[in-house]
């Protein structure tokens, strides 16, 4: 499946469509080729999952290597030793199974509200895929059971808090493993008994934070595209100029995502009667930055999302447990450390906060009679008697403020744990929670902007906006009628927000 940041701007000259959806294909796990789009398909659309037969052979080979090392009497972390600060404690072979069982039971100590179902499904999928790399030393029955659970819709309750993301997401993955051994809150067809190394191989990894990151990156790209439609509609509503989106300007500063943003805006704003109505004799020389600099700002947002996508896409197929099996060797390392994903999530949070702030400023220009080039105050039919979008703009301002507070990076908030053995930790799950909250806020801000922009266009009739903007306006009107008198707007905002998440307005 195509990665999300690719092909954002149509390469053809056809019309932009809003809400086009493609049917996901079944996903086969081989530990090498899982994509973000695959994660979304399985996590949210219940696409079936299978295991690659050749990759299963590699899984079996790595298991034989672990068993051979045990027979040779080699000391292996987490196989015949304690964990973390207790790694110096040697564990007799006859207690190997109990060691793995104790690990799962003790580490299943997460707290807080449960993760949503799509996040749990993403985590399950990613954990199975990592095991399929053949470097974890587990039996094939582990990924096989995970896939059976996914395909049958068996999802354990996984608390959302309690992971610092250092030895991976120990608590969330332990709650998943608890179900697999028959001690969780969901019944599995055939609970397994964990053999040497298998408990550690299962819980040592970044799959909780990476699953959340994959879903967030997908949603962030959808919002990025939607924000361009909202920007185009706002520009039309206040009779702004598309001239600053001329390709020559952006080729002179060739940041790739700035160029793509400008190209998308040019396509959105082509053939506008509204533009032609004020092309000549307009006393305004230049629009405000929130209109004129949209490609520069959203282009930078796109660069941040592309960076995050690259890190997340790599992590989907990365071996993140410890120790790892390479041929006949079992090596200890630190691939479980979640810093790459925590950093990616912090970048997403900052990028989406920037997007949200820009959207709120455009919204202000549409509703403010001093800035809107002739639209009625707050888009009300009878300003004064009616308040129109006054409080909707205040709601957007409140959401922006919350985004800015939450944009403080989590990946620098290290708190040493486990007797100072884990002395540098990335806080990836905290970064994921913050980024998710910012995403939800930003979606609502763009929803309010879409509603206001659509209302603004009502006052410019019979002039017609650009064809793509007209289609977007019609799509918004399917969810929310024009404001003819004051009414509560909460339901309208939430409906449009839901459609944004579904990709209904993504150009």
Question: Language-model segments: what does each one mean?
Answer:
Residues 21-47, 51-58, 62-70, 179-507:
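C-terminal auxiliary extensions adjacent to catalytic cores
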Residues 22-37, 43-73, 100-158, 217, ...:
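Glycine-rich, flexible loop motifs
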Residues 74, 89, 261:
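Polyanion/phosphate-binding surface patch
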Residues 157-167, 245-247, 326:
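Short, surface-exposed recognition loops or helix-turn segments adjacent to catalytic cores
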Residues 77-91, 95-99, 106-129, 159-181, ...:
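FAD-binding core of FAD-dependent oxidoreductases
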Residues 1-20:
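N-terminal amphipathic/basic-hydrophobic helices that include classical n-h-c signal peptides
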Residues 93-108, 365-377:
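Catalytic or ion-translocation cores adjacent to nucleophile or general acid/base/metal-coordination motifs
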């Amino acid at each position: 499946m195509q990665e999300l940041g690719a092909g954002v701007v149509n390469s053809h000259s056809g019309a932009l469509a809003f809400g086009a959806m493609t049917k996901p294909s079944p996903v086969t796990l081989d530990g090498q080729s899982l994509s973000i789009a695959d994660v979304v398909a399985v996590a949210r659309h219940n696409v079936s999952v299978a295991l690659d037969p050749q990759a299963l052979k590699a899984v079996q080979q790595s298991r034989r290597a672990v068993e051979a090392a045990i027979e040779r009497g080699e000391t292996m972390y987490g196989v015949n030793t304690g964990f973390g600060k207790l790694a110096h404690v040697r564990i007799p072979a006859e207690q190997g199974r109990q060691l793995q069982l104790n690990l799962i039971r003790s580490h299943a100590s997460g707290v807080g509200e449960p993760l949503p179902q799509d996040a749990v499904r993403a985590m399950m999928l990613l954990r199975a895929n990592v095991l399929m790399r053949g470097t974890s030393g587990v039996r094939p029955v582990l990924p096989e059971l995970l896939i059976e659970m996914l395909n049958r819709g068996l999802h354990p309750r996984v608390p959302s808090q309690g992971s610092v993301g250092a030895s991976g997401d120990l608590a969330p993955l332990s709650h998943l493993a608890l179900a697999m051994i028959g001690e969780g809150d969901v019944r599995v067809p055939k609970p397994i008994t964990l053999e040497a190394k298998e408990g550690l191989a299962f819980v040592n990894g970044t799959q909780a934070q990476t699953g959340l990151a994959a879903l967030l990156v997908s949603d962030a790209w959808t919002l990025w595209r939607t924000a361009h439609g909202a920007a185009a509609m706002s520009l039309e509503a206040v009779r702004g100029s598309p001239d600053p989106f001329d390709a020559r300007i952006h080729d002179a500063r060739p940041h790739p995502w700035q160029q793509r943003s400008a190209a998308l805006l040019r396509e959105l704003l082509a053939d506008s009667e509204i533009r032609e109505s004020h092309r000549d004799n307009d006393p305004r020389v230049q629009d405000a930055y929130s209109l004129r600099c949209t490609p520069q700002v959203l282009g930078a947002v796109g660069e941040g999302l592309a960076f995050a996508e690259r890190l997340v896409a790599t992590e989907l197929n990365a071996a993140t447990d410890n120790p790892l099996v390479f041929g006949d060797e079992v090596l200890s390392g630190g691939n479980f450390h979640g810093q790459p994903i925590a950093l990616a999530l912090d970048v997403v949070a900052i990028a989406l906060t920037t997007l949200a702030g820009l959207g709120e400023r455009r919204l202000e220009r549409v509703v403010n009679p001093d800035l809107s080039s002739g639209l009625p105050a707050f888009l009300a039919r009878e300003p004064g008697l009616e308040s129109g979008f006054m409080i909707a703009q205040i709601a957007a301002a409140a959401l922006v403020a919350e985004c800015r507070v939450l944009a403080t990076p989590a990946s620098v908030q290290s708190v040493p744990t486990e007797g100072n053995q884990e002395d540098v930790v990335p806080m990836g799950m905290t970064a994921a929670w913050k980024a998710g909250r910012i995403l939800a806020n930003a979606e609502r801000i763009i929803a309010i902007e879409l509603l206001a922009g659509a209302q603004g266009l009502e006052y410019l009739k019979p002039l017609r906006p650009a064809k793509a903007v007209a289609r977007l306006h019609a799509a918004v009107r399917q969810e929310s009628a024009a404001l003819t008198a004051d009414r509560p707007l909460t339901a309208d905002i939430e409906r449009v927000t839901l459609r944004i998440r579904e990709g209904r307005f993504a150009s």
